[in-house]
């Protein structure tokens, strides 16, 4: 499957979802979901950001093999700054989410801002909206 070359940016404050191109230079240099998501995080967030503030980001990322038949290709990563340690926190999971995200046309979802109330992200193929 490789890369779809699309990043979904979800602004919870504005209630908007926008597609942007994947930084392919970073994708080549920081291969894999963890490396690429971490690169996006450190480039976009102030190192002193409060983990519980609207300025912190939450990044869901897939790798180039996600959704293929390769062994362990069902893995995907979540990166943010954790409130417990104040450091970058990384979680890795398996299952169908990563492959489904990739099949919908997205390599990564970046959540930013803070919503006024509870919302959820509805992804239907290449369309995404907050409800």
PLM regions: where:
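Acidic carboxylate diad motif detector
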Residues: 1-131
């Amino acid at each position: 499957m490789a890369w779809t070359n699309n990043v979904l940016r979800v602004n919870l404050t504005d209630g908007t979802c926008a597609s942007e191109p994947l930084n392919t230079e970073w994708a080549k240099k920081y291969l894999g979901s963890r490396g690429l998501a971490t690169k996006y995080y450190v480039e976009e967030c102030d190192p002193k950001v409060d983990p519980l503030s609207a300025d912190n980001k939450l990044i869901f990322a897939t790798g180039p093999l996600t959704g293929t038949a390769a062994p362990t290709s069902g893995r995907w990563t979540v990166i943010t700054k954790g409130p417990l340690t104040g450091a970058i926190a990384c979680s890795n999971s398996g299952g169908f989410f990563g492959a489904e995200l990739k099949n919908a046309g997205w390599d990564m979802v970046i959540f930013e801002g803070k919503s006024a109330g509870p919302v959820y992200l509805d992804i239907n193929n290449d369309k995404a909206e907050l409800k």
